[in-house]
Amino acid sequence: MQYPEPIAQLIDGYMKLPGIGQKSATRLAFFTIDMAEDDVTAFSKALIAAKRDLHFCSICGNITEGDPCSICADKTRDQTHVLVVEQPKDIMVMEKMKEYHGLYHVLHGVMSPIEGKGPEDLNIASLINRLQQNPNIKEVIIATNATPEGEATAMYLSRLIKPAGIKVTRLAHGLSVGSDIEYADEMTLFKAVEGRTEM
């Protein structure tokens, strides 16, 4: 049986989201149809506003409404440390911990030969430029996930940054291999930052 075009389009739209297959997309489409019209309108407005009003900070690559983002604009933060993460959501996780008070830099991914993603596809050039322009930065903490791609990216960054005389450290491995920062609890993250090791 073929679905009416509006439902088919809704299913196709949901399937573009990560981790959503045909079954889940169909379930979400029918759930959306059952929602009150006001709720659907509010949801669609929120989607449009997020896409229209949010962009990447020109300094660190975080998601923000203003430029620079509130973290880069905050002069009370420790200007000597930059913690490098894969995605903007990782910053939210680190900030929840309330133990790290330095700056951030978002790579927007990791190097992955399988996906055809090299250093030029990541937000690395702006990190190097930032380090060259800011002599206050004394340490770069690499907080890529403990996956083969995250480790390879960390090693690449270390080799790139160390010759400039900047200390490069890696989060301690309280994070299990293959785990994402996003899913780590606050105490594990705190221990990982505290026990970071020099690369």
UniProtKB/Swiss-Prot annotation:
Entry annotated with the keyword DNA repair: yes
GO terms of biological process kind: DNA recombination; DNA repair
SUPFAM superfamilies xref list: Recombination protein RecR (SSF111304)
Pfam families cross-referenced by the UniProt entry: RecR_C, RecR_HhH, RecR_ZnF, Toprim_4
UniProt domain Toprim: residue ranges: 80-176
PROSITE patterns, alphabetized: RECR, TOPRIM
CDD domains attached to this UniProt entry: TOPRIM_recR
C4-type zinc finger span: 57-72
Keyword field contains Ribonucleoprotein: no
Keywords carried by this UniProt record: DNA damage, DNA recombination, DNA repair, Metal-binding, Zinc, Zinc-finger
Function in brief: May play a role in DNA repair. It seems to be involved in an RecBC-independent recombinational process of DNA repair. It may act with RecF and RecO.
Record-stated family: Belongs to the RecR family.
UniProt name for this protein: Recombination protein RecR
Gene: recR
